[in-house]
Curated annotation (Swiss-Prot):
Protein species of origin: Tomato aspermy virus (TAV)
Family listed: Belongs to the ssRNA positive-strand viruses RNA-directed RNA polymerase family.
Catalytic activity: RNA(n) + a ribonucleoside 5'-triphosphate = RNA(n+1) + diphosphate
Protein name as annotated: RNA-directed RNA polymerase 2a
The entry's keywords: Nucleotide-binding, Nucleotidyltransferase, RNA-directed RNA polymerase, Transferase, Viral RNA replication
Signal sequence coordinates: none
Amino acid sequence: MSTFSLENCLNGSYGVDTPEEVTFIRRRDANPSAFHGEETVPSNTTEVHSESVSYSSDFEGYSCDSDFTGDNQYSSFDGADSLLLSYDIDEYIDLSESELRVLFDEMVQPIHFGMVLSPTFSRNRFLSCLSLAKSVVVAPLYDPERTLRPFPELVKNLYSGVHDIYLSDSEEAAISSVTDTIEGYTFSPRDVVDNYEPPPLCSVCGLIAYQCPHYDINSLRKNCAEMTIAHDYPIEGLCGLIDDATLLKNLGSFLLPIQCEYTKLPEPTLITPPELTRPTDRVTVDLLQAICDSTLPTHVCYDDTYHQTFIENADYSVDIDRVRLKQSDLLAKVIDEGHLKPVLNTGSGQKRIGTTREVLCAIKKRNADVPELCGSVNLKRLSDDVAECFMLSFMNGDKLCSSNFINIVSDFHAYMSKWQSVLSYDDLPDLNAENLQFYEHMVKSDVKPSVTDTLNIDRPLPATITFHRKQLTSQFSPLFTALFQRFQRCLTKRVILPVGKISSLEIKDFSVLNKFCLEIDLSKFDKSQGELHLMIQEGILNRLGCPVHISKWWCDFHRMSYIKDKRAGVSMPISFQRRTGDAFTYFGNTLVTMSMFAWCYDTSQFDKLIFSGDDSLGFSIKAPVGDPSLFTSLFNMEAKVMEPSVPYICSKFLLTDDFGNTFSVPDPLREIQRLGSKKIPLDEDDRSLHAHFMSFVDRLKFLNHMNQTSMTQLSLFYEMKYRKSGDDILLVLGAFNKYTANFNAYKELYYSEKQQCALINSFSISDLIVGRGKSSKASRRKAVESNGKHRDPSTRDHSKVGTDESKETSTEETTQTEPQGAGSQKSK
């Protein structure tokens, strides 16, 4: 009988029976009782592969032929010489020496005498015992009426020379007497089932079915076909067919008679191609809230209604050097008339009130604890080199020489006309008589939306504003406005500042696709600026045409300043750091960012450079090369190169349309957070809400410019930046399109408790008139008759109209306060 293997079974080469095997099968089927003890198959058809292994002195007298295949050892096994096989033990042969020793200790359990084992370990002997024990367990050679020992005990006995493979009667009785102590479970011995079924024989010729020409294997295959795992996972490369007779005869009890078919799955047919499918969900508030729940998981559970109350009432400690508190003449809190409440919960914060503790928290984060990351440098020489590098990298020398005109007077009159409601020419002070080192301080009432999932552990703090009063700002703002306009005119073509009348983020004939982006994120930008940055600004202003004495004067009262928050009674000295509300804030931050960028990177490798305050973005064909570590070691900045970098600046994504032009799109994640704003004042005519709506429409004017190409870009850039699903962006854009259509749709996103109360109180029943109840029935009838007369216009006394109407009004007011049941009884 041919050797069985899974490969031969699957390709159909195993199972070809000889005439001798057919005769043996017929004889065994005719008289099964006489088969026991009879020779199974002629010896010429079964080739037994065995090896005689000789061993060293540690395994003396042992061989596979003499010790384990002799008649004295297995005399109870009929046909043992012809059926004993050498089973494969590849899983043991592949083990290392140490792993085999561990297995040897577990199975053989030798006795340890120090470093000596009894019996000693021999790799060849142990592997032979494993093979022989496996053949004894697997091959059907043992007496079915007796119980074999477990496999580890078989290996131990064979290795020790004790050839006892069966359990004794006492051991079998001990095993059978063991009962399960777990309630609800019962165990009973199970007889070994052969599961042998005789192959089908042809009634015409008497041959086995698959050898008979009358046997229709195709019909049998169709009848026995079942859905298996192969229908879900097609297996290719299987050729040949295994019929039931061959499968059962050779595998016996190891397999069930199941007919297997292997076919390829058909290609799915789609009515609409996947690339043309679009979401068709109707835009609703619930759908928008579901997007917020999945995109901002920590924001939807965030409620800071009482956070500031906790700060005001809890114990408070803060570490700030040289701070002064004045609690005697604090300004009273401004009482407002309430705010509209958003329907969407997007994690927006409540309006912050500038109390003493809130201001101290903001100063601690925004002004105090200045980082010290840079080393010692020559400030004068380094500032001159950085300013000169700035001019060579960004400025067009020819334009700078020809554009030497600065129109300060016209800018001054434009500034005064803009603020004429609060400022006049008579209010302008004498700058020589003013202390320009003194700055006012306040905290912003609104908090910038957070896009990180940290609201469950971190409370956002408001930003601070350090500013001069309007009369002083009006003296410097026209000068810096004129300088900034000249600065924009003299820039090279590849540099863009997205502010003012001559520049924006809409770039013609430029595509952001197929380019490398470089975005530098600068943390703690305002308070990290020191004397080096101040000297760099002074050098650049002098090169742009600012009078030297004015630039020096401006820088002098920025070296050491004093800020004071009158409302909170907090004041402290600061030095060098950026004043966030003066006339030079945006211009100065942009100059500092550009100068640091030019020193750390070669700007000639970029096709486009965009700067705005502390934001920067560069586009290049090749990967940018530079040293961003200089931001920290030289300029005292906490800088991070954004990876993966996307075209994103000023909270906007840059996209390219089908005509090769670039336009900007506000960040959808920030816009959806603004829809849940809690700082819109409550007005009777919705003036504030309408202003908020118009601002929302102005920011989303790009919607008419969007098509499928730009939406695909936006979805991809959104996934790269935030690592969130970009499929929600299409639904968000649909919501933006709905709520920018008209103001009535936008009003669905906000409500007011006062408006709800007024709406409830507007519903009244004018016909329900209730008289005062008395104990006598006559008074009740009289009240009913009087009420009936009042309801009849023909019988009503016009001389008592005013009196009756006042009574009806009083009774209606009492009806609202009485229970409904009592009122209905009295109204009859």
